[in-house]
């Protein structure tokens, strides 16, 4: 009874729960009848919400004893005499008088039917009006369904008549005339009999009502029928049973029966914290619900479309939708997804990544005349390249690429190579994009040439590549090109370069859309470097065909055609090599001309420069104008003064107690939980990610436990590493045949170095590792994801933020934790084998 009394007490004129809280009668005296009634209504609503909050939080008793109906009937009560209804005579039953038909009400007119409110069947559907039997299975609920909110159930709110509401609003417009207007507009209200003037005998409540509450009635409904959906049929069932319990079992009065049964009904459908923990388990929190994240359509429309782009709609458009599968497990804040394969995305990608730098038609920088002629590359060691045979080319590939290039080589035997084979086929890259960091970036496009052209071009580029990387590397004391080195070798190289300077500082160079800014002059300079080592007229012809690119892009619902001069085609065989040649030689020329002693490390368009701090200002003043003169927009990143804070290819060096190695950013945890392959390949993909990652990150805080979790919950790896999308992960070069999976113990040195690198304290590191070590397999609707089909996976528009994302926030560098003193300078002449022996 306390449940309803706490709500109804506010109607009593003199009731006040605490000193200083005005009663209803005092509110009438101070604010008038209208405002007093609204205040009372608000107080009653808050009291009702408090009861529902107590149900949600488990703060109310739900095990109050409910006497059985039979026991209640045995109690001495004055039984009411009920007259037996008269039965019709046989003659009446056999009569055929149909006069009752005429007495039936007439059916509604057409106008009435058209103006009526929709029925429940029309609103909810007939299927929702059925009573759902209790199945005993757990109902999966999302975190957003059960988080506390100001109003946790839809409690009915009484409202005053419109005329009274308008009068109250009028007082707000003219505060000074509030009381006068209320007096002028006061209606003659009908007299209502209050109290008990006729001495009507009132109902007496049964003894159980002294302790009974709505929460106990709601739990009784749960015990009888389970936790059901709030369909109209289930509402009718629950309300009827609750009224029977209160009337026949507890001896409740009419008022108590109605109000308490209504409140108990809301609680029956309202989930509690215990429901979340028991019914839904740990879904959407730690176990990792698997979601199908919808592909993304760019919302940015080009304000200026390049006149070179010709757009054509497909005659028979196909579905453009792509889906990425995300494991919503404990991890940093991220929302990884993939762009749809649509004409809309393709047009923006080509427009902003080939012709313009934004959607407003801003052209990329053009190099100054003769700018590349000043770059000296005479220091490169001379060597001669022996071309491969075409059979060597296709045999160097695996999987589907091997089949494709074998077919291309066979076709070259029947039809010679022509300029038309140099045409470019463009498509939207199925790239994992963090849409929380970049809400609407321009989609990236891949622009490969025909396999026939690539097969012939590979005859020269494949043997040239490793030799030219080595020649570039020997421009410095330690290698300046990271290609060919694994994570440990790269970490040792960075550490040794750092140790060469008394007061080192590292500056990262980030070229904005590097491929787009590779002009014809930049291509001619790069090809001039190639020709120093490859002497072939066929090779020269292939290089000339790359200056003007005729491209055709395809999406599921349309096509584009365009022609562009220059630009690095992202699918070209020499994309990585050409970018390394440009960045190393351009940056080296700048620093040499400034007279700054330095060390360089490059991987494509990702470049870092290490120097003494005294030269930093001179370098910063010169770097942007220098690259602008060459046609590049260069962003100079913030300098770092601690070895562990050096950013290179989304990794940072960490010392594990024995050696330095490059460790991926902590955001890789979220990225590894996203995949864009087929659902059936998801277990194999997770297993491959874990196995490849642990080969490099064994013994590294957080990563060690997370990657072993992926291996534990994945499936058989199979041939997933031959998948075309595997290259996008970038783990192959990161590993390079290394296996440190046997290193399972995380050293104290590793924890301190990891804290300096990523700002996660050793205490938080251990807490995260304990969570990953205890996690089971990801789920779909409460079932192991390996046992369900893709149709069972819930599709969402974006990954929801979680309250545990802040566990991974960088809390700042801890200089005391840096392990820079453990750098071994090594030998003057660097060789990879010698470096590995030192590790």
Curated annotation (Swiss-Prot):
Pfam families reported for this sequence: RdRP_3 (PF00998)
One annotated GO biological process: viral translational frameshifting
Enzyme Commission no: 2.7.7.48
Keywords: Nucleotide-binding, Nucleotidyltransferase, RNA-directed RNA polymerase, Transferase, Viral RNA replication
One annotated GO molecular function: RNA binding
Main EC class the enzyme belongs to: transferase
Reaction it catalyzes: RNA(n) + a ribonucleoside 5'-triphosphate = RNA(n+1) + diphosphate
Annotated RdRp catalytic domain residues: 504-619
Function: RNA-dependent RNA polymerase replicates the viral genome.
Protein name from the UniProt record: RNA-directed RNA polymerase
């Amino acid at each position: 009874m306390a449940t309803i009394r706490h709500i109804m007490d506010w109607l009593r004129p003199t009731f006040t729960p605490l000193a200083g809280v005005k009663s209803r009668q005092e509110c009438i005296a101070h604010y008038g009848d209208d405002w007093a009634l609204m205040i009372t209504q608000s107080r009653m609503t808050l009291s009702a919400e408090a009861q529902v909050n107590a149900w949600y939080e488990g703060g109310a008793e739900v095990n109050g004893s409910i006497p059985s109906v039979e026991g209640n009937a045995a109690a001495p009560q004055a039984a009411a005499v009920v007259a037996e209804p008269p039965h019709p005579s046989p003659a009446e039953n056999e009569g055929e008088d149909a006069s009752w038909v005429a007495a039936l009400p007439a059916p509604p007119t057409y106008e009435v039917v058209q103006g009526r409110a929709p029925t429940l069947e029309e609103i909810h559907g007939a299927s929702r009006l059925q009573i759902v039997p209790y199945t005993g299975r757990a109902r999966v609920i999302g975190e957003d369904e059960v988080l506390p909110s100001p109003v946790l159930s839809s409690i009915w709110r009484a409202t005053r008549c419109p005329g009274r509401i308008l009068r109250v609003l009028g007082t707000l417009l003219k505060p000074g005339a509030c009381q006068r207007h209320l007096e002028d507009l006061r209606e003659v209200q009908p007299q209502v009999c209050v109290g008990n003037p006729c001495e009507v005998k009132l109902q007496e409540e049964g003894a159980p009502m002294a302790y009974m509450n709505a929460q106990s009635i709601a739990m009784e409904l749960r015990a009888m029928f389970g936790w059901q959906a709030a369909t109209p049929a289930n509402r009718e069932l629950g309300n009827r049973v609750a009224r029977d319990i209160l009337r026949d079992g507890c001896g409740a009065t009419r008022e108590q029966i109605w109000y308490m049964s209504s409140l108990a009904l809301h609680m029956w459908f309202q989930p509690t914290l215990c429901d979340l923990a028991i019914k839904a388990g740990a879904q959407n929190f730690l176990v990792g619900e698997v979601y199908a994240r919808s592909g993304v359509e760019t919302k940015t429309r080009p304000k200026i479309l390049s006149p070179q782009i010709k757009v054509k709609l497909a005659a028979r458009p196909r579905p453009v939708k792509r889906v990425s599968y995300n494991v919503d497990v404990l991890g940093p804040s991220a929302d990884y997804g993939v762009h749809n394969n649509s004409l809309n995305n393709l047009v923006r990608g080509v427009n902003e990544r080939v012709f313009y730098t934004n959607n407003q038609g801003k052209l990329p920088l053009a190099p100054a005349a003769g700018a590349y002629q000043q770059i000296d590359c005479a220091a490169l060691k001379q060597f001669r390249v022996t071309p491969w045979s075409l059979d060597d080319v296709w045999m160097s590939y695996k999987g589907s690429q091997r089949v494709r290039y074998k077919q291309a080589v066979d076709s070259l035997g029947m039809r010679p190579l022509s300029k038309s084979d140099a045409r470019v086929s463009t498509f939207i890259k199925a790239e994992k994009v963090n849409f929380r960091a970049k809400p609407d970036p321009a989609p990236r496009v891949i622009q490969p040439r025909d396999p026939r052209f690539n097969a012939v071009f590979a005859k020269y580029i494949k043997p040239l590549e490793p030799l030219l990387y080595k020649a570039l590397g020997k421009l410095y004391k330690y290698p300046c090109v990271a290609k060919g080195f694994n994570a440990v070798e790269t970490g040792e190289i960075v550490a040794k370069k750092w140790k060469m300077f008394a007061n080192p500082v590292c500056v990262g160079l980030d070229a904005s859309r590097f491929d787009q800014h590779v002009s014809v002059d930049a291509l001619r300079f790069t090809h001039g470097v190639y020709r120093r080592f490859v002497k072939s007229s066929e090779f020269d012809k292939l290089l000339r065909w790359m200056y003007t690119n005729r491209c055709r892009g395809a999406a599921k619902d349309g096509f584009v055609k365009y022609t562009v001069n220059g630009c690095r085609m992202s699918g070209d065989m020499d994309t990585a090599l050409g970018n390394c040649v440009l960045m190393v030689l351009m940056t080296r020329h700048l620093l040499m001309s400034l007279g700054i002693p330095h060390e360089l490390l490059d991987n494509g368009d990702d470049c870092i420069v290490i120097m003494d701090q005294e030269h930093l200002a001179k370098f910063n003043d010169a770097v942007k104008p220098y690259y602008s003169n060459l046609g590049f927009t260069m962003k100079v990143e913030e300098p770092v003064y601690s070895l562990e804070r050096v950013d290179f290819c989304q990794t940072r060096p960490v010392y594990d107690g024995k050696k330095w190695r490059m460790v991926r950013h902590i955001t890789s945890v979220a990225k590894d939980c996203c995949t864009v392959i087929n659902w059936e390949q998801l277990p194999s993909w997770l297993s491959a990610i874990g196995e490849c990652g642990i080969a490099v990150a064994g013994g590294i805080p957080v990563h060690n436990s997370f990657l072993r979790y992926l291996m534990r919950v994945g499936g058989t790896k199979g041939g997933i590493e031959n998948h075309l999308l595997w290259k996008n992960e970038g783990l192959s070069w990161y590993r390079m045949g290394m296996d440190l999976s046997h290193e399972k113990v995380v050293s104290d040195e590793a924890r301190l170095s990891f804290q300096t690198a990523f700002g996660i304290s050793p205490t938080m590191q251990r807490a995260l590792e304990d969570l990953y070590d205890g996690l089971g397999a990801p789920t779909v609707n409460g079932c192991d994801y390996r046992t369900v089909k893709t149709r069972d996976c819930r599709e969402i528009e974006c990954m929801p933020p979680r309250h545990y994302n802040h566990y991974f926030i960088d809390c700042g560098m801890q200089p005391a934790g840096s392990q820079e003193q453990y750098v071994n300078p090594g030998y003057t002449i660097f060789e990879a084998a010698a470096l590995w022996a030192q590790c």
